[in-house]
Amino acid sequence: MNIKKKSFLFQFLFGWIVLSSAQWLSVLDEAENLNSSFSLESVDSFAPVRPRFIIDEDFAEDYNLTVDILHRPLQENFDSFFPNVEAYVESGNSNGDLMSDNGKLDDLNSRAAYSALKALQNSYGSSHLYRFTPYELFGQSIWIEEAPEVNHVGWSIMFDNLGRYFLLELRGLREVTFALFITFSIVPIITGILTVYIYKKKYCVIKFNKSGRSKKKDSWLKRSKDELLRTDSANLLTLNDNDEPVMIRHSCKRTCILFATLEYNIPEWNIKIKIGGLGVMAELMSKTLKQYDLVWVVPCVGDITYPVAETAPSLVVKVVNQDYEVKVFYHYKDNIKYVLLDSPIFRKRTSHDPYPPRMDDISSAIFYSVWNQSIAAIIRREKVDIYHINDYHGALAPIYNLPEVIPCAISLHNAEFQGLWPLQSSIDEREVCGLFNVSKTICREYIQFGNAFNLMHCGVSYVRRHQSGYGVVGVSNKYGQRSWVRYPVFWSLKKIGQLPNPDPTDIGLSVNPVNQQLPDFAEYASVRKENKRKAQEWAGLTIDDEADLLVFVGRWSVQKGIDILADLAPTLLEKFNIQLIVVGPLIDLYGKFAAEKFMYIMERYPGRVFSKPEFVHLPPFIFEGADFALIPSRDEPFGLVAVEFGRRGAICIGSRVGGLGEMPGWWYSVESSSTAYLLKQLEKSCTLALKSTPEMRHKLRIAALQQRFPVDEWVALYDRLIRNCIKAHNKQQQRRSIKSFFSCITPNKPTKDVNDILSEKSAFSPADYEHSIDIREHTSYDANSMDNDSDEDNYEQAESIISSLSSSALSELSYISESSMNIGSRLDERFIDANGVAIRDFSAELTYLTPENSKGKLSIDHFLNKVQSRWHDEEHHYYKTGFRKRVYKYLKIKDKKSKDVDPDDDLVNQLPLNAYTKPRYKSAASTRLNIYQRILYLKVFTWPLYTIFLSLGQILSISSFQLSLLSGFEDNNQISLYVITGVFILSTIVWWGLYRNLPSVHSLSLPFAVYALAFLFTGISSMSLPYHIRGWLSYAATWVYAIAAASGPLYFTLNFEDEHCSGLGSSITRACVLQGVQQLWLSFLWLWGTLSSRLDYNYKVLLQPINSVYVVAGVWPVSFVLLSVCILLYKGLPPFYRQKPGSIPAFSKSLLHRKVVICFLISVINQNFWMSTLISQAWRFFWGSKLTKLWKIVVMTVSFLVGAWLIIFYVLRKLSNKHTWMVPVLGLGFGAIKWMHVFWGTSNVGIFLPWAGIAGPYLSRALWLWLGILDSIQGIGNGLILLQTLSRRHVTNTLMISQLAGSATSILARFVSPTKTGPANVFPDLTGYTPVDRAKPVANAPFWICLILNVALCIMYLRCYHRENISRP
């Protein structure tokens, strides 16, 4: 839906509801007024009805009485009167003065005017004034019998203190109220749509790069090689400007670097194991880092026969407390020492598949445990200077040598994969730690992240603790920063650096490329034409010089966007004369479906498409003959393919993510992760490229040929990285030494260091798999050959021991980095189409393939999401409910005969940790879950029953901004507010503590018991008891309710955690449904509070206990239901909510490193400081008017909060299916919408609309409801921002902290805020404005500070959202 249609829809929606409601209700009012006891013949038809003035509270305090600050009853026994505006009273005015110096009371309709009236009364049309006591005036009203002109809003009163009389002066302009009404109605919509438009134009663009890398990035070419590689003349190295220098001693010894990779090459043995960028960079390191001594640790794979090599003492590692031998062989080449590790677990891998297929099962745990322990032993044996870690595979190795530490550098080639195993219980922790041979203490201090054993986090923790966080780099200029933004494991670091990969073929420093001789156009075109023909012949395509040759080379996976290319291919083939070559190895299910689709496309377009889903060594003419290189990656750390094609003259078309976008070509931004958006962006880019002129293409190719990604630049940056890592390590060691020295001096202040951690008792005793970290060398080895035979018995023994593990699959968890949102509608890893039904269905439907449905119904992502939804539904029934039999189409069921499964089978290796150790039988649900859990898993409209109950907890809760709802509903009840806020703060701390220390089932079920107690007290307070007892019970009910309401953030963040993510659309659906219901609930709570407020005999406002059996009959069943929900949740919440809370080292530090958290906290504090004291008055404006009928306001409320909300919800969901950023950006685009909402309800502007006639009160409240809806949309957007920028654990803690800060700010606002006693000049009353006043009403600092802060925070929040959004690459 485009912007114009969206704007029209919002304006039409608002206009239709407001005008129709106002006109309909005004007709009813007009009919009733005709039968009233007074005459309207002399009253202008545009004037409001029922005026009155109310005396000031300050004057009443002189008589130890408090006047009625609610709406006073009116006297209707006058035949004629001036129908003026309804008035409110505040305890004070903006400046503390009751009257101006000239005796003039300005602004009849302002709060100051009502406060200044004192006890003055007009006696039967005379202007003479009399003074009465407040008690005598109770129930009285002041009447002005002359109406103002239609162009004015009210009167100003002139007092004569000596003569004791007053004069009236016309004040206010109806044009002002009309302008404010139109502004508040339309401006938020206009600014919201304008913000969306600007955001889309700025970020959702296709960048045409016609020159390649920026001049700044190529500035190194102006320097000589000596300057580039020259080390500092001094003995000092620097990390930061404010760091103290650390001396590095010169040594003749060359720096020794150890790195370990699963991809490697040994040229003299003709061995090359390489599938990606990591293998390329490992090979480059071995060729170019001649100034270092390199120790390269590699495993032996099963399909390669290795020559005889030098043998070395074997290593003995532990797996589940069992010794396991790893043989070691050495091979030397120049400055490289190859360390080859030989063991059965490594031999199971092949040269084409060196990595374990999963990283959350038993086989992979054994693999990486043996791998990392072996690396640790080699580090200790070789005495290296620094260990270079590549990705997560070897990140665990350094902790095995603690307390000895070594400098480390970490290169992130693909940070999305981190090496994860579940730690959902103490049993999981014991078994996984046993697999990896680490103690529980080390696991918690270094490795554990949430409820996962995270290898990448181990490396990050090691660098953070021992190098002050320095040493982690990305492989491109942007990838490091984006990795820091997207993955929570890096948030404890201040930043991630950059070490951009080079082009391995760009060897040597050449002259400035501008001075290079450019090829002749005709000659170059002839060479390209010949190479293009060779490429067409190689691929079996039709020889066609006029056809544009498009090439895709890469892994066939969702990350590389192969499904997007397959969906778009029919459209491109129909519209343009193109040929397509698509090659690369299959990786995941998306690649499998893309291969099936390309097979059909090849048959449909013979001679135009070549598809080969396997790893292929491409000849050079493929790169040199391609017209365009297609790179539709959803995420790309570096993008070596773009460099390889671009530097050979191909023009690039692809996504501008990670390291992509620096070569000449068309690059589209990936602001949204939805497939529909990516398809549209790729189609636009291809269209622009294919329609470009030959001259433009030649210029782009020439620019591409000049691009430089020199190896020498990378070597210089690598040198700096190594030096600084060693410096950071030495500096941290000095700090620890100083710290240890002072610890010895002051033993009363012990510090916990690595030695202390290791000295603690391990979790694994001999009787309970306890062990010390032990990696021993074994000397029994074959000294003559390097064969494939090894200690199979040991390995089989280890496998037999660990086969009893029963941990759940990590894919069921979503707390790590919300990775299910990182690539949009990404398929869950557990669905592998095991029975092949999905691929057969897809193949059958391809017979109806067209260019249109290829991007819609037959889109790979769309089809797999539909299948996945069906598969999850079948799995949900089979494993979680199973109350009735049904036929399963996509779920593969194992029978009892499948108990013994071969662990070597590829399918088994892709199953969760407990998939084959505990086979699932036919009665899976009844054997795994109790009856309560099965009941709560039953679905109601796709929502499991437990999610509905948890949603109820969110609906019943209130925020710190709404605390005055429970404080007696009136501003003068300060003590009640302080008590409520104090209870709310303490309760927040209690619920937060339960969440962090106990399984979440406790913090999610117990609040319902507290809610039940609150409703029980409410019922008791309505019984025939002494008045003071019922009053205290009413207050007790509110206090108890506040205790339960403080748990609200937990229900927001923890709900739906056990359900599989269905994309952002489902999140918006849930948010809109819950927000709509919560709005209704809060609205009627405010109505209840307004109606139940009363005066005692001293005219003090109290919460009136209603003595009625109907109240008991209504609230006690609710209390019983809530108590039942508590019991059901405690017994029936899914196993996910029963796992122990996981720890995250340096969690507070990581939270404060996120700017969106800081911005959110400031926003909450700002709102509570300026507006929390006024929320009750705003709701009094809505519900408490005497100018409206209550039932009509109820109808209007339901119409807006149900009817209008459903329409808005439908529109927002549709828009978010394509643009995942739409709702957050639209909400922030509304600007200071909460400020407008409070302004309209508290500044008297909404009380009297002279241009609207008797429909004015309803029209005014319709606008207030509309502003409330827009405020709710902004609130939903803010919630989505938190979910799209933080992990759920971070969101929970952020909301808890903000709740505490907001509550404390609410109390502070009652003392120091300019709005502590009323709107004051922060929300000035403009109803008395005249041109003579000029800018006086708004010429005050608090007004502008409040307004500017609210607008500025929206802008800041939007910038933080764009920069820290983890749902985009």
Curated annotation (Swiss-Prot):
Keywords in alphabetical order: Cell wall biogenesis/degradation, Glycosyltransferase, Phosphoprotein, Transferase
GO molecular function list: alpha-1,3-glucan synthase activity; alpha-1,4-glucan glucosyltransferase (NDP-glucose donor) activity
Catalysed reaction, written as an equation: [(1->3)-alpha-D-glucosyl](n) + UDP-alpha-D-glucose = [(1->3)-alpha-D-glucosyl](n+1) + UDP + H(+)
GO cellular component: ascospore wall; ascus membrane; fungal-type cell wall
GO biological processes: ascospore wall biogenesis; cell wall organization; fungal-type cell wall (1->3)-alpha-glucan biosynthetic process
Modification sites for Phosphoserine: S219
InterPro entries in the cross-refs: Glyco_trans_1, Starch_synth_cat_dom
Transmembrane segments: none
A Pfam family matched in the record: Glyco_transf_5
EC number: 2.4.1.183
UniProt keyword Transferase present: yes
Family: Belongs to the glycosyltransferase group 1 family.
Protein name: Cell wall alpha-1,3-glucan synthase mok14
Lineage, uppermost ranks: Eukaryota, Fungi, Dikarya, Ascomycota, Taphrinomycotina
Gene: mok14
